[in-house]
Amino acid sequence: MNLHEYQAKQLFEHYGLPVKNGAVCQSVDEVDLVLAQLSGDKWAAKCQVHAGGRGKAGGVKLVQDVEEARSFAEKWLGQRLVTFQTDKLGQPVNQIYFEETCDIDKEFYLSAVVDRASQKVVFIASPAGGMDIEEVAQNTPHLLHKVEIDPLFGGLPYQGRELAFKLGLSGTQNKQFTDIFMGLSRLFLEKDLSLLEVNPLVLTQQGNLVCLDAKIAVDDNALFRHKDLSALQDLTQNDAREAEAEKFQLNYVALEGDIGCMVNGAGLAMGTMDIVKLYGGKPANFLDVGGGATKERVAEAFKIILTDPSVKVILVNIFGGIVRCDLIAEGVIAAVNEVGVRVPVVVRLEGTNAEIGRQILAESDVNILTAHSLQQAAELAVNAAKGEH
């Protein structure tokens, strides 16, 4: 679950991390009231969406007075912001965050992620702040500095000092950075985060470090023990199909292809998308129905996939480990009839009672293309998408 910048900075404040004063508005009428809470004669106005690249898309602007702030709010509130991280529809802008400005001397990058290979939290710091970190990693990897945090012990002061030295910080700034590092480490572990990013972390001309931006992603599997964070979820930022899928415990991610994919198991789902791509097709989605692929869940999966008007064919790839393939076959037939599927359906079954399942599909009166291998299934699906079935 992603948080908005203003929500992330509220958490930062709670953990004693240095941020500039800011306030959020949800209507143009609130702009004057919000700015009255802030000092200075110019402010940073930021569209609040769950996506990066806001600045390049015009979603961040330095406003010089109240009128310019109102104009920015009028332009964006109720509109959708399209960035390189969104789809072509963009994300809805429901709030504008106004923040006091500061005089910047240097910009740094600081983030933390879970490294599953080492089973630790990795902090990444770079003197190249305010830039796309992907470009830094590709073009100047020597500017990335890392330390690993053992989740049993948390961040240790010497690790913060080590990163600070590598960033060229000494004296007071070294201590400030270490304090920020320790606070972010506590925040990451105590709130079960999966991503934390400060880009940029700035050194002001007055010699103070400030978290000028904040990005936080919370592990969805840990939300049950963080009711306060769960309450911050902004469902308007979610794809409507993804939100609907969550209700039925389906893992769905919308893509931009025309071959709908329904698979049990995340790894198999990713492999299915890979082979569809290999055969020249484009997956329309990632959809994992999980181990308990019941008739009801299969039916809901069909409904969700078919809400995408781009879908020309549906590829069902099921490995019968926990579930039996004959039951899956019956569920697919029932779901196709119930939903009224009008596009070709390709089904590949493997595992427990796979042969029985294929026989059930063959004897049904439903127009289903049966595949005996994943390669054949992908080829059938790609051809069907081209109208060659």
Swiss-Prot record:
<feature type="binding site">
    <location>
        <begin position="53"/>
        <end position="55"/>
    </location>
    <ligand>
        <name>ATP</name>
    </ligand>
</feature>
<feature type="binding site">
    <location>
        <position position="264"/>
    </location>
    <ligand>
        <name>substrate</name>
    </ligand>
</feature>
<feature type="binding site">
    <location>
        <begin position="321"/>
        <end position="323"/>
    </location>
    <ligand>
        <name>substrate</name>
    </ligand>
</feature>
<dbReference type="GO" id="GO:0005829">
    <property type="term" value="C:cytosol"/>
</dbReference>
<dbReference type="GO" id="GO:0005524">
    <property type="term" value="F:ATP binding"/>
</dbReference>
<feature type="binding site">
    <location>
        <position position="213"/>
    </location>
    <ligand>
        <name>Mg(2+)</name>
    </ligand>
</feature>
<dbReference type="GO" id="GO:0006099">
    <property type="term" value="P:tricarboxylic acid cycle"/>
</dbReference>
<dbReference type="GO" id="GO:0004776">
    <property type="term" value="F:succinate-CoA ligase (GDP-forming) activity"/>
</dbReference>
<dbReference type="GO" id="GO:0004775">
    <property type="term" value="F:succinate-CoA ligase (ADP-forming) activity"/>
</dbReference>
<dbReference type="GO" id="GO:0000287">
    <property type="term" value="F:magnesium ion binding"/>
</dbReference>
<dbReference type="Pfam" id="PF00549">
    <property type="entry name" value="Ligase_CoA"/>
</dbReference>
<dbReference type="InterPro" id="IPR016102">
    <property type="entry name" value="Succinyl-CoA_synth-like"/>
</dbReference>
<protein>
    <recommendedName>
        <fullName>Succinate--CoA ligase [ADP-forming] subunit beta</fullName>
        <ecNumber>6.2.1.5</ecNumber>
    </recommendedName>
</protein>
<feature type="binding site">
    <location>
        <position position="199"/>
    </location>
    <ligand>
        <name>Mg(2+)</name>
    </ligand>
</feature>
<keyword id="KW-0067">ATP-binding</keyword>
<feature type="binding site">
    <location>
        <position position="107"/>
    </location>
    <ligand>
        <name>ATP</name>
    </ligand>
</feature>
<comment type="pathway">
    <text>Carbohydrate metabolism; tricarboxylic acid cycle; succinate from succinyl-CoA (ligase route): step 1/1.</text>
</comment>
<keyword id="KW-0479">Metal-binding</keyword>
<comment type="subunit">
    <text>Heterotetramer of two alpha and two beta subunits.</text>
</comment>
<keyword id="KW-0460">Magnesium</keyword>
<dbReference type="InterPro" id="IPR013650">
    <property type="entry name" value="ATP-grasp_succ-CoA_synth-type"/>
</dbReference>
<dbReference type="InterPro" id="IPR013815">
    <property type="entry name" value="ATP_grasp_subdomain_1"/>
</dbReference>
<dbReference type="GO" id="GO:0042709">
    <property type="term" value="C:succinate-CoA ligase complex"/>
</dbReference>
<keyword id="KW-0816">Tricarboxylic acid cycle</keyword>
<dbReference type="InterPro" id="IPR017866">
    <property type="entry name" value="Succ-CoA_synthase_bsu_CS"/>
</dbReference>
<dbReference type="Pfam" id="PF08442">
    <property type="entry name" value="ATP-grasp_2"/>
</dbReference>
<dbReference type="InterPro" id="IPR005809">
    <property type="entry name" value="Succ_CoA_ligase-like_bsu"/>
</dbReference>
<comment type="similarity">
    <text>Belongs to the succinate/malate CoA ligase beta subunit family.</text>
</comment>
<dbReference type="GO" id="GO:0006104">
    <property type="term" value="P:succinyl-CoA metabolic process"/>
</dbReference>
<keyword id="KW-0436">Ligase</keyword>
<feature type="binding site">
    <location>
        <position position="102"/>
    </location>
    <ligand>
        <name>ATP</name>
    </ligand>
</feature>
<feature type="binding site">
    <location>
        <position position="99"/>
    </location>
    <ligand>
        <name>ATP</name>
    </ligand>
</feature>
<feature type="binding site">
    <location>
        <position position="46"/>
    </location>
    <ligand>
        <name>ATP</name>
    </ligand>
</feature>
<keyword id="KW-0547">Nucleotide-binding</keyword>
<dbReference type="InterPro" id="IPR005811">
    <property type="entry name" value="SUCC_ACL_C"/>
</dbReference>
<comment type="function">
    <text>Succinyl-CoA synthetase functions in the citric acid cycle (TCA), coupling the hydrolysis of succinyl-CoA to the synthesis of either ATP or GTP and thus represents the only step of substrate-level phosphorylation in the TCA. The beta subunit provides nucleotide specificity of the enzyme and binds the substrate succinate, while the binding sites for coenzyme A and phosphate are found in the alpha subunit.</text>
</comment>
